Swiss-Prot record:
InterPro entries: DNA_mismatch_repair_CS (IPR014762), DNA_mismatch_repair_MutL (IPR020667), DNA_mismatch_S5_2-like (IPR013507), HATPase_C_sf (IPR036890), MutL/Mlh/PMS (IPR002099), MutL/Mlh/Pms-like (IPR038973), MutL_C (IPR014790), MutL_C_dimsub (IPR042120). SUPFAM superfamilies: ATPase domain of HSP90 chaperone/DNA topoisomerase II/histidine kinase, DNA mismatch repair protein MutL, Ribosomal protein S5 domain 2-like. This protein is involved in the repair of mismatches in DNA. It is required for dam-dependent methyl-directed DNA mismatch repair. May act as a 'molecular matchmaker', a protein that promotes the formation of a stable complex between two or more DNA-binding proteins in an ATP-dependent manner without itself being part of a final effector complex. Disulfide bonds: none annotated. Belongs to the DNA mismatch repair MutL/HexB family. This is DNA mismatch repair protein MutL. Pfam families: DNA_mis_repair (PF01119), HATPase_c_3 (PF13589), MutL_C (PF08676). It comes from Lactobacillus gasseri (strain ATCC 33323 / DSM 20243 / BCRC 14619 / CIP 102991 / JCM 1131 / KCTC 3163 / NCIMB 11718 / NCTC 13722 / AM63). NCBIfam families: mutl. PANTHER family: DNA MISMATCH REPAIR PROTEIN MLH, PMS, MUTL, DNA MISMATCH REPAIR PROTEIN MLH1. GO terms for molecular function: ATP binding; ATP hydrolysis activity; ATP-dependent DNA damage sensor activity; mismatched DNA binding.
Amino acid sequence: MSKIHELSPELTNQIAAGEVIERPASVVKELCENSLDAGSSRIRINFIDAGLKQITVQDNGSGIAKDQLNLAFTRHATSKIATERDLFNISTLGFRGEALASIAAVSHVEVITSSDNLGGVRAIFVGSEKKLQEDAASPKGTKISVSDLFFNTPARLKYLRSERTETLKIVDIVNRLALGHPDVSFTLTNNGKILLKTNGRNDLRQDIANIYGHQLAEKMEVLKGSSPDFKITGLLSDPNTTRSSRNFISLLLNGRYIRNYRLTQAIIAGYGSKLRPRRYPIAVVNIELDPLLVDVNVHPTKQEVRLSKEQELERLLTTSISEALDQNSQIDSGLNNLLTPKKSTNIDQLKFNLNKDVVDTVRPVEFTPQVEADKSAEVHETAASFVSLDKVRNDDKYVITATWDENVDKQVQLSPFDEEKDLQGKDDSIISSGDEILANSLPELIYLGQTKSYLVARHDEDLYLIDQVAAYRRLAYDQIFRDLNSENISQQGLLSPLILDFSNVDYLKLKENLNNLQELGIFLEDFGQNSLILRTYPIWLQPDVEKNVRMILDLYLNQNEQDFTKLKAQIAGEITLRQSTRRRNLNPVEAQELLKNLRNSSDPYQDFEGKIIIIQLSENDLNKMFKKDE
């Protein structure tokens, strides 16, 4: 066994760099935070080849004194804390004294700095070793150039993503810094091209416009809230302007960008029922608090923190956001419903969507599910006054369990289709071109009549109840999915071309993938200044073309892997949900045509969300319901 020995300073610096400097964006973050702590009002960042070739950060801050330059590049040397007490009262972004030493350990660093306007110093470090120091003319402030990142740790390079991805990570981190410090002017350039420029006039809305686009910034709501311990400020998107990812929520603590799941959930909770499922707001929320209430000494990146009075802060966030949104809405927030005690039920863990057609005289029935319900399923209360239906999954077949009130001891199991039919192999929501239409599994039904949103039909001796709205949704979904998979998606011209603004990050992603978007029927052209122009659109994007185009682009940007079949299924589902599908009285010809089309659909038994379309009632089932002897 090897003897215990002390590691060399060079090796310990490389180990520390592995925690602090994960990628080029980490270098940008650490250098910009140093500039902010130095009191800079102007920060310029330029990088080449995703930062691997060179990163330069220049500021007009306090600079580094000539006699302290060597110390600045020594591990655990800092001007920001001095005693143990300071560790629990941190008001700066940095404090660990690791950044410059860690950067120098894995790169070539040139620093030019001056703490006054009389003269400065220039130094070069290679792998933690100082190669040169000399006097140099320099205005007050610091300019640091980092080149050949990871030159002496090539294994780190294989863990980096593509050049485009690393570029986007740099843009994202500078965006967050700019949002946290609207009083500082940031300029970010890549290979000489400006990606972000803020004016430093302490105008958060203008900074959001520079990052996310003017169209979005103009519609954002002002957020204000306070308590004895916290002050909350920021801007929020309205509930109709959302994204499919939480990445557009920027949570700032005394100007520091942090990640905190519970606080993020509190922000989302503030929107209550105004948000559609799986949609998230765009929000910039800054929380000011006494540094004694937060511990930032948790992780080297300082993006994870521990908070005192976190529950109090969560409540303040949720309440403040709810009030800010309600001030600009005449619609009562569903958030208040969360405070109303629920009626006793044995299946509180399931979500209910109450059918608005249920008559006032319906008496609620408490019941117990016969098997463990699929937690992802939604349960709908029917218009029947004597039965509630619980949708469960059992051996890949749907079973409807009708349970009577407590005075009736018999139960009836109704199947939406003949249990002998084999429906295995169907995907829940994805249809491929090779799928076989299951026409033979649903018999030809004869229309009998309609009650509200339900059609009544028969085949032989059996009755069938068909949810009209769910049936139309199935047909609409199938049609849109077929259109998305056609070789040539028919287009309709816009009277006035639609100019779409994007965040700088999204613009760069979309600009490189314009050809891929054409496969989705979206033909965009570059319009410059973080904008793309749309001249034509698929007909099924009506009536709100812009909102639907943005939805498609949002889904495309946030897919984990490029799976176009899955993406098209998601798009078809979202478009179907956005189209207005209301129950209406059908004449017999229309009703019979609906039944015919449903029979020829990809799945006549459930819509694309898995909600039941049709229920079968045999004569035996009816006899049991009417308590007739078998």
